[in-house]
């Protein structure tokens, strides 16, 4: 996927690899441990001793009942009703949009229709009570899962696992932003990022549950389609748990806006097992022809992960008899689910919330919807093309329409030991024994030896390795990946730029903590608290040399010029920050912003200029992102100023209002002193210099002053203003380049202070 648009759509989510052995829409389930609490759970108000469950836990606002005489469920659903969404056209819109994005970003689609069918859209009948505003996005997600699933059915084990791993990394970049996840730049990852952004915009907390569910599916199924199952009893639990529960649970709860706690999921898990078995078996039954064709076309596959195939092997029967057995199993599991659900409602209704009951009821519609939709979709009937050529406008139970309606929006003491000369000699050996080994020859006449062994770099690198190991959001890495949507820098050069920026950034962290006398860094002891000030300074200086050497390897005079120029500016900015603190001199707002442009924004400016120098594009096609990186640097620094005073996470990682201990003139403090000069506050700052820190009580007093002058409110307003301006600048750049940057938009969303 070397095209620009493929790279562009990729970066916008640190999300990025959205896969799903969506063996089908309807065979997914969730692990209880992944659900999130979203406030107080509404408990049932049923009367004690109630001898019957409510007829329905769901209020039908968004769907209508389909006349059973107009469809045939083959007797597989035990009489479960079929409902269809009133805005099914939104589901069609989401499916078509996903297919268009795939063709544009990934490649051609063959023999694929996904959720679409001439009569019913799969999501419209599987989740008929989906919140209308979420229907298009949910269908897009399921369509994307189908497309990914089709890849898995046509590749070998290693390629399939890599497809899943790529998708998992995309989820991890959002769910675990502190991890240094290596992002893919494929078109599929761009689609994943785009989708994640849409889901987060609709409902961030519930979207995170869905993303975690999807991640669990991807990780659980990796390589599972290549398992050699010998019996249905062996296959089905694996199919249900690893290829079903996580994804579909996340889809249903997000689509319907349900909040189901971990405890409720544990309690209802035995109830839902036969429901997911029904979905899995039905999917395998209807998708048999499709999967068998793909199986025959893939010589690397030795077995099919399909219930019909396994029944044929287990019982030594032909295809038709295996299908009959499979149908019987579907009916049995469906009836078992209905029995367990009724029993649970009668005996344990008050133990869970209404939303948990709604989830259980929603599964019934997923069962009937899956069975009926599967009979219409050419996904499983591609050998009958007359069923599908174009989606019709239907003003019946399918409710298809052109009206869009709703937009989707180191080392212990050592000892010298004499050994024979054939033992390798080294001056430092950090072995587990803590013993340094030297030869007799070395002990006798080292002063005359001019070709002594090279010294290890372990000591000089130890502080760097320590600070690198601390938790980090890897914002700079994500920013580089996002910008590369526009610059298209080759991967080898891009990695060297990342390495150089990492080395500079970590050097600045070590020196900053010394200069600010900060004992904590990201909730851990600062580097100089472990290795001492002198060793830390030396290690930081070494990093500057290492970064220069890395830039040299880019073999570009322009890159060297950029590196030296921006490094000078970075040190100038830091010198001003230190000068104001040391002399208790409050800068003007203009001086503060310019300092930020030099210091914090310097690395972002360096990144953009280095990427511009190494871009294979002509200079007129390389976008000017200087305004964007300047604004981003300001937003990043002001956000840090604000969070240092207001965020519990910052308090846990660095200490309570650590900027006040350091005497740093942050934006809130500058605003306070500028708008309402205060002798008491100025005296506090001078005393801080004398004492080296502030007491807890004094910090509270400073915060009171900041509140009185509305300086914290002002800082938040500046953040909001910058956030809006950043999006406008992003709009301009996307228009100029013709490439959307979803990864950069996702990064801005992650950094947004609410």
UniProtKB/Swiss-Prot annotation:
Keywords: Isoprene biosynthesis, Lyase, Magnesium, Metal-binding, Multifunctional enzyme, Signal, Transferase. Residues 1-24 form the signal peptide. GO terms for molecular function: lyase activity; metal ion binding; prenyltransferase activity. Binds 4 Mg(2+) ions per subunit. It catalyses: (2E,6E,10E,14E)-geranylfarnesyl diphosphate = preasperterpenoid A + diphosphate. Mg(2+) 1 binds at residues 149, 153. It comes from the Eukaryota. Mg(2+) 2 binds at residues 149, 153. Its cofactor is Mg(2+). It is an enzyme of class 4 (lyase). Asperterpenoids A and B, but not the final product asperterpenoid C, exhibit potent inhibitory activity against Mycobacterium tuberculosis protein tyrosine phosphatase B with IC(50) values of 3 to 6 uM. Residues 392-403 have a biased composition (Basic and acidic residues). Residues 389-753 are annotated as: Geranylfarnesyl diphosphate synthase. Mg(2+) 3 binds at residues 512, 516. Mg(2+) 4 binds at residues 512, 516. CDD domains: Trans_IPPS_HT. InterPro entries: Isoprenoid_synthase_dom_sf, Polyprenyl_synt, Polyprenyl_synt_CS. Coiled coil: none annotated. Residues 58-388 are annotated as: Sesterterpene synthase. Pathway: Secondary metabolite biosynthesis; terpenoid biosynthesis. GO terms for biological process: alcohol biosynthetic process; mycotoxin biosynthetic process; terpenoid biosynthetic process. Its EC number is 4.2.3.-. Bifunctional sesterterpene synthase; part of the gene cluster that mediates the biosynthesis of the asperterpenoids, sesterterpenes that exhibit anti-tuberculosis activity. The first step of the pathway is performed by the sesterterpene synthase astC that possesses both prenyl transferase and terpene cyclase activity, converting isopentenyl diphosphate and dimethylallyl diphosphate into geranylfarnesyl diphosphate (GFPP) and further converting GFPP into preasperterpenoid A, respectively. In the N-terminal section; belongs to the terpene synthase family. In the C-terminal section; belongs to the FPP/GGPP synthase family. This is Bifunctional sesterterpene synthase astC. The gene is astC.
């Amino acid at each position: 996927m070397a095209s620009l648009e493929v790279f562009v759509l990729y970066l916008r989510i640190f999300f990025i690899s959205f896969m799903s052995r969506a063996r089908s829409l309807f065979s997914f389930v969730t692990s209880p441990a992944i659900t999130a609490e979203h406030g107080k759970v509404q408990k049932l108000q049923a009367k004690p001793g109630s001898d019957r469950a409510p007829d329905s836990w769901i209020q039908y606002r968004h769907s209508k009942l389909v006349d059973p005489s107009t469809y045939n469920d083959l007797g597989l659903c035990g009489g479960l009703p079929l409902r269809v969404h009133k805005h099914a056209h939104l589901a069609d819109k989401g499916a078509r949009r996903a297919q268009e994005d795939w063709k544009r970003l990934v490649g051609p689609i063959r023999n694929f229709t996904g959720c679409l069918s001439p009569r019913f859209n799969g999501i419209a009948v599987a989740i008929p009570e989906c919140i209308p505003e979420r229907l298009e996005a949910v269908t897009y997600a399921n369509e994307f899962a189908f497309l990914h699933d089709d890849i898995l059915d046509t590749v070998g084990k290693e390629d399939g696992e890599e497809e899943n791993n790529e998708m998992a990394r995309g989820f991890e970049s959002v769910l675990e932003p502190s991890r240094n996840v290596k992002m893919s730049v494929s078109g599929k990852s761009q689609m994943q990022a785009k989708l994640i952004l849409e889901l987060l915009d609709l409902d961030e907390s519930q979207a995170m549950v869905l993303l975690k569910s999807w991640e669990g599916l991807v990780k659980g199924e990796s390589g599972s389609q290549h398992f050699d199952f010998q019996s249905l009893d062996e296959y089905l639990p694996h199919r249900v748990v690893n290829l079903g529960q996580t994804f579909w649970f996340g889809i249903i709860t997000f689509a319907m806006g349900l909040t189901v706690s971990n405890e409720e999921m544990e309690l209802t898990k035995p109830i839902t097992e036969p429901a997911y078995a029904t979905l899995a078996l039905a999917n395998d039954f209807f998708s048999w022809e499709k999967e068998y064709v793909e199986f025959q076309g893939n010589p690397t596959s030795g077995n099919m992960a399909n219930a019909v195939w396994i029944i044929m092997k287990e019982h030594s029967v032909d295809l038709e008899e295996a299908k009959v057995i499979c149908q019987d199993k579907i009916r049995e599991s469906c009836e078992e689910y209905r029995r367990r659900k009724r029993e649970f409602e009668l005996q344990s209704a008050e133990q869970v919330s209404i939303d948990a009951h709604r989830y259980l009821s929603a599964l019934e519609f997923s069962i009937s919807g899956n069975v009926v939709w599967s009979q219409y979709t050419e996904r499983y009937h591609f050998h009958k093309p007359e069923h599908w050529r174009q989606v019709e406008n239907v003003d019946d139970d399918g409710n298809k329409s052109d009206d869009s309606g709703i937009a989707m929006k180191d080392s212990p003491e050592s000892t010298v030991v004499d050994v024979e000369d054939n033992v390798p000699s080294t001056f430092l050996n950090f072995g587990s024994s803590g013993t340094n080994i030297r030869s007799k020859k070395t002990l006798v006449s080292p002063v005359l030896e001019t070709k002594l062994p090279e010294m290890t770099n372990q000591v000089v690198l130890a502080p760097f390795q320590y600070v690198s190991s601390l938790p980090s959001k890897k914002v700079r890495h994500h920013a580089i990946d996002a910008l590369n949507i526009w610059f298209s820098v080759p991967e080898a050069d891009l990695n060297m730029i990342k390495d150089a920026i990492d080395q500079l950034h970590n050097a600045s962290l070590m020196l900053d903590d010394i200069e600010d006398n900060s004992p904590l860094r990201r909730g851990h002891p600062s580097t100089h608290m472990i290795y001492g000030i002198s060793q830390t300074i030396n290690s930081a200086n070494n990093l500057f040399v290492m970064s220069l050497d890395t830039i040299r390897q880019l073999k570009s005079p322009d890159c060297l010029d950029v590196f030296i120029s921006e490094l000078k500016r970075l040190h100038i900015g830091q010198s001003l920050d230190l000068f104001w603190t040391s002399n208790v001199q409050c800068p003007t707002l203009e001086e503060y912003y310019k300092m930020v442009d030099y210091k914090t924004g310097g690395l972002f400016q360096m990144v953009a200029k280095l990427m511009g120098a190494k871009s294979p594009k002509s200079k007129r096609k390389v976008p000017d992102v200087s305004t964007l990186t300047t604004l981003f640097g300001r937003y990043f620094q002001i956000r840090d100023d604000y969070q240092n005073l207001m965020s519990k996470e910052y308090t846990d990682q660095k200490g309570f209002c650590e900027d006040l201990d350091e005497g740093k003139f942050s934006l809130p403090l500058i605003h306070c002193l500028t708008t309402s000069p205060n002798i008491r506050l100025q005296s506090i700052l001078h005393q801080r210099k004398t004492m080296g820190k502030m007491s807890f009580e004094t910090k509270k007093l400073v915060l009171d002053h900041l509140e009185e002058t509305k300086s914290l409110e002002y800082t938040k307003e500046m953040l909001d203003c910058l956030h809006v301006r950043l999006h406008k600048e992003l709009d301009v750049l996307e228009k100029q380049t013709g490439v959307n940057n979803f990864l950069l938009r996702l990064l801005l969303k992650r950094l947004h202070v609410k």
